[in-house]
Amino acid sequence: MQTTNGSDSTLATSGATPPNQQTPPPPQQWQQQQQQQQQWMAAMQYPPAAAMMMMQQQQMLMYPHQYVPYNQGPYQQHHPQLHQYGSYQQHQHQQHKAIDRGSGDDVKTLWVGDLLHWMDETYLHSCFSHTGEVSSVKVIRNKLTSQSEGYGFVEFLSRAAAEEVLQNYSGSVMPNSDQPFRINWASFSTGEKRAVENGPDLSVFVGDLSPDVTDVLLHETFSDRYPSVKSAKVVIDSNTGRSKGYGFVRFGDENERSRALTEMNGAYCSNRQMRVGIATPKRAIANQQQHSSQAVILAGGHGSNGSMGYGSQSDGESTNATIFVGGIDPDVIDEDLRQPFSQFGEVVSVKIPVGKGCGFVQFADRKSAEDAIESLNGTVIGKNTVRLSWGRSPNKQWRGDSGQQWNGGYSRGHGYNNGGGYANHHDSNNYHGEN
């Protein structure tokens, strides 16, 4: 009894916890457990195999004595890169160390496209972490939905490491999926200053591309003749994963860009002739407003109140899929206008009013019209450079002349990059345009 009492006394005086009682975990430990549980739950967004791995890792962190490292198991033998998931969070604390970024031309960032919806920064980092050269990873997401836009960027500590990844991984199958890697140089490294933002944009639009044309092939087609070519991008349909039949090439020299506009227009890439035109930069959008009155004159109409005012489209007309095409060559016929636009989606109708120097293209859906405006604005159709903007929707006809439903105005237009880069969802420059 004395021994027992002594033991009880010892427990009481020492503050020890009896065996049948548990001391609540310290706040810091409790928060850590909560965070681990949240990470565990987040793993459920991954495919079963990847989710299982992440949950195993969380269990290892909480109960290390019960688990052996899974890089010794059979799953790791088949998926050697995926064991890097856990090291990513620790690596993020090291990614801001001083890095020798070299000269302005020493780009060390790769664009990675065709990402599936569940492929986040952790996954993307795991694909290349074995190089020991990954500096930072970013997956671009929609600002409204937070869903992945299907592409991201990986910056390496050296250009040599980036080049090796580009050469060895392009076209190979991504871990835990049937999706091949689609990799290209990003236009800017995260360590570079985007001084060119205030300079001229030296990009060209390339249309009528064969379905088999890739970023690499498009880049080679132009860079073989023009050494200043910085990047090339074939726009991919995010739903089908297939080429939309057009892309963009960025130059570093204005003279070479000008030569390419004439020399490469009609040249072959793969088995099809290309159509080359000027790609309209984002900052040109604001300048389009000043031309609205000129476009109204081209449309040749008056508003219902008698003033010059055709086609001022409200931004709320989210279903409008009609495009105003200004500056048309007088010799251009409906079919000449239909052909370049049809590569962006189903064209419902084309109308060129006689003697007006303009035309109207109506798509079956808004998205196709947006893509066409982004890509064809400022390109050459026939002999002239055309200007595109939203026209008046056919279901909103003017009073008096039903034929004037096509007399859309030259209201707010769209640049080709819609967010800081080449094309809608697959551009390297969007890395710096997103938050």
Curated annotation (Swiss-Prot):
The keyword Nucleus applies. Its main location: nucleus. SMART domains: RRM. GO terms for molecular function: mRNA binding; poly(A) binding. The keyword RNA-binding applies. Induction: Repressed by ozone-induced oxidative stress. CDD domains: RRM1_SECp43_like (cd12344), RRM2_SECp43_like (cd12345). One of its GO terms (biological process) is stress granule assembly. Interacts with the poly(A) tail of mRNA in nucleus. This is Polyadenylate-binding protein RBP47B. It comes from Arabidopsis thaliana. The gene is RBP47B.
